[in-house]
């Protein structure tokens, strides 16, 4: 399970170093293989360990190619999907189209989301945090059926 936000750098060759604490689980459980694709709701990338991605692919396989919305979803997620492997230094290469989609430059954030990571431009991440906090403050959590009994 991946959790926490890590500030990392994108090097001039388009590579990022995965934080050390995540490397061993990625190597042992997923042979260092990761699939990167776009987030269809935010300007960030999603990084799935290979076995998690295979679950997503199984769901995508069941979607219709004749339904416009389903086909569009498949086209974006699969069209941008790129499999990478951790190198000996724990780095992965982010292909240019993916870097462009998420407006990634030098300073980026790798954010654990339990079964996957999000990869954000640092400034976009800070803005996203502000938006999330505003949403939570503006919503009546008790009226949200899935959050009504959620407590910390």
From Swiss-Prot:
- Locations listed in the record: Cytoplasm, Nucleoid
**Main location (coarse class):** cytoplasm
The UniProt transmembrane annotation reads none
Q: Which residues form the SpoVT-AbrB domain?
A: 5-52, 81-124
Q: Which PROSITE patterns match?
A: SPOVT_ABRB
Cellular compartments per GO CC: cytoplasm; nucleoid
- What's an example Gene Ontology biological process for this entry? negative regulation of DNA-templated transcription initiation
Q: Quaternary structure per UniProt?
A: Forms oligomers.
> Would you tell me the protein name for this molecule?
Transcriptional regulator MraZ
| Species for this entry | Shewanella sp. (strain W3-18-1)
**What is the name of the gene encoding this protein?**
mraZ
């Amino acid at each position: 399970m991946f959790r926490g936000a890590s500030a990392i750098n994108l090097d001039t060759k388009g590579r990022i170093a995965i934080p050390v604490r995540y490397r061993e689980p990625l190597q042992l459980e997923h042979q260092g293989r990761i699939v990167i694709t776009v987030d269809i709701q935010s300007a960030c990338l999603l990084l799935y360990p290979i076995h998690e991605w295979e679950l997503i692919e199984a769901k995508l396989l069941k979607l219709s190619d004749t339904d416009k919305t389903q086909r569009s979803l498949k086209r974006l997620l699969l069209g941008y999907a790129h499999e990478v492997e951790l190198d000996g230094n724990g780095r992965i290469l982010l292909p240019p189209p993916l870097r462009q989609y998420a407006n990634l430059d030098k300073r980026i954030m790798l954010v654990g989301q339990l079964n996957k990571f999000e990869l954000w431009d640092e400034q976009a991440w800070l803005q996203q945090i502000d938006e999330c906090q505003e949403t939570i403050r503006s919503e009546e959590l008790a009226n949200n059926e899935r959050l009504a009994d959620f407590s910390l």
